[in-house]
Amino acid sequence: MGQSPNGSTYSEIPSKYILVQGNADLKDGWVFPRIWTTQKTRVANVGDIIMTVRAPAGSVGKTSYNVVLGRGVSGVKGNEFIYQSLVKMDIDGYWKKLAAGSTFESINCDDVNEANLMVPKDIDEQDRIGELLSILDNLITLHQRKLEKLQNIKKSMLNKMFI
């Protein structure tokens, strides 16, 4: 679990460390830097999985940076299979059910550590499954971008037609 640096060390200007605080710092399954800090508290390394533990709990992303973890996130060591399993748990509402009933939606370290993941013992099998799901994610992203381009073209044409 993360530990927030002193607020006086935050900046929107890129500096020493990228700070990941929560869902606002994750975009399309990846850490998207928006806040920096000069204070190093708890960290996650390149390739680690970042999971939000406060409202909304359970959103996940990967990091291609070394980052400082704020109080609203946790760093998880794991391969693509573990990442995809955590994504599925989020989609299925697993974390929301755990957080239900509290005033402020959150999960704790025990909730994460005790999560029941069905993981093949064979690392090669995990890697193959993770790679296949990653390929599908990439394909979905490509189609989403094409859809956005087509929607922008349509919007532009409609604007020109009705001016």
Spell out what each predicted region is.
Residues M1-I163:
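Feature detects amphipathic, helix-rich regulatory segments
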